[in-house]
UniProtKB/Swiss-Prot annotation:
Protein name: sn-glycerol-3-phosphate import ATP-binding protein UgpC
Originating organism: Salmonella typhi
Keyword Cell inner membrane in annotation: yes
Keyword line: ATP-binding, Cell inner membrane, Cell membrane, Membrane, Nucleotide-binding, Sugar transport, Translocase, Transport
Listed Gene3D superfamilies: 2.40.50.100, Nucleic acid-binding proteins, P-loop containing nucleotide triphosphate hydrolases
Single annotated GO MF: ATP hydrolysis activity
Residue ranges of domain ABC transporter in the record: 4-235
GO terms under biological process: carbohydrate transport; glycerophosphodiester transmembrane transport
Lineage: Bacteria, Pseudomonadati, Pseudomonadota, Gammaproteobacteria, Enterobacterales
Places the protein is found: Cell inner membrane
Annotated EC: 7.6.2.10
Gene encoding the protein: ugpC
Enzyme class: translocase
Catalytic reaction(s) noted: sn-glycerol 3-phosphate(out) + ATP + H2O = sn-glycerol 3-phosphate(in) + ADP + phosphate + H(+)
Cellular component terms (Gene Ontology): ATP-binding cassette (ABC) transporter complex, substrate-binding subunit-containing
Length: 356
């Protein structure tokens, strides 16, 4: 096994536009890291720099304690799995998996041994003589992974490998990837825009935005304690409710436009008068009553999801989404009285967006 280290890595186009801000990341031996973020955030560019397909503008990349910053891709000890399977249509599954080893000059016996072992791990034993056109999307992606496995790389690089699959296959392949990593324990760097993939596959998640690593942490840490307003809005489905306001002069209330306010703890008195964003996840909002001082939500629409429901509505001029139990189905125009538990709230600086 081998670790991966990025040391103050940057990438600029034309010497001007910096698409990757100075970024440092230590990936332990056998760790599975997922980079997630919206299109254009720099995650695929960063992966390509690790692979050697893009030059680093500044900084260093280390794989298995070796500096590989200027090395060619073939010398870095990596194997890459792409969104597009990139299989040779005229070759069988076995030939596709073996091709990279053949051009490296390995013996036939050694190649056969590696291919058979990879096929066994990926349950492709009965498909080795088939051509790609005879396979399903999930089977083709397993062949692409098998081609990477036979290389026995120091690091696996995955570039949105499940994006071309339908919803059911994506679930199946996520489970297979988890099982594969438990067996191989190979250091892995995985890129996706799908937060469900990120949260279910990763040992640690790196949330990226405009070339910056906004937060690096376990899925639980990123969900429970988002480091910034961006992370709070990106991680979670539906997204966290975000309310813009200001800490009152007395420091004991969060004041919103339209005369609305929420009581807050004494710990924020030092922030009196500061603009803030208050966040709370839809699943953390509780039902209350007018007598208990609840917040009135006028229901606009109801999404019935099966296991639970989402009520979209307004508290004054503020939009809120609340997750309800399956049997709770308020009609449009009705009022729900809500409680926003203080221990479930998050506060972010109104200017920097960073967690307070």
């Amino acid at each position: 096994m081998a670790g991966l280290k990025l040391q103050a890595v940057t990438k600029s186009w034309g010497g001007k536009t910096q698409v990757i801000q100075p970024l440092t990341l230590d990936v332990a031996d056998g760790e599975f890291i997922v980079m997630v973020g919206p299109s254009g955030c720099g995650k695929s560019t960063l992966l390509r720099m690790v692979a050697g397909l893009e030059r680093v503008t500044s900084g260093d990349i280390w794989i298995d304690r070796k500096r590989v910053t200027e090395m060619e891709p073939k010398d870095r000890g990596i194997a890459m799995v792409f969104q597009n399977y990139a299989l040779y249509p005229h070759m069988s599954v076995e030939e596709n998996m073996a091709w990279g080893l053949k051009i490296r000059g390995m013996s036939k016996a050694h190649i056969e041994e590696r291919v058979r072992e990879a096929a066994r791990i990926l349950e492709l034993d009965g498909l080795l003589k088939r051509r790609p056109r005879e396979l399903s999307g999930g089977q083709r992606q397993r062949v692409a992974m098998g081609r990477a496995i036979v290389r026995e790389p120091a690091v696996f690089l995955f570039d949105e490998p499940l994006s071309n699959l339908d919803a059911k296959l994506r679930v199946q392949m996520r489970l297979e990837l988890q099982h594969l990593h438990r067996r191989l324990r190979t250091t892995s760097l995985y890129v996706t825009h799908d937060q469900v993939e990120a949260m279910t596959l990763a040992q640690r998640v790196m949330v990226m935005n405009k070339g910056v690593a906004e937060q690096i942490g376990t899925p639980v840490e990123v969900y429970e304690k988002p480091a910034s307003r961006f992370v709070a809005s990106f991680i979670g489905s539906p997204a966290m409710n975000l309310l813009d306001g200001v800490i009152s002069a007395s420091g004991d209330r969060f004041e919103l436009p339209g005369g609305l306010a929420l009581p807050i703890g004494a710990g924020y008195r030092g922030h009196a008068g500061r603009k803030m964003t208050l966040g709370i996840r839809p699943e953390h909002i509780a039902l209350s009553s007018q007598a208990e001082g609840g917040v009135p939500l006028t229901v606009d629409t109801l999404e019935i999801l099966g296991a639970d429901n989402l009520a979209h509505g307004r508290w004054g001029d503020q939009k809120l989404v609340v997750r309800l139990a399956h049997q709770q189905r308020p009609a449009a125009g009705s009022t729900l009285w809500l409680r926003l538990p203080e221990h479930q709230r998050h506060l972010f600086d109104g200017e920097t967006g960073q967690r307070v």
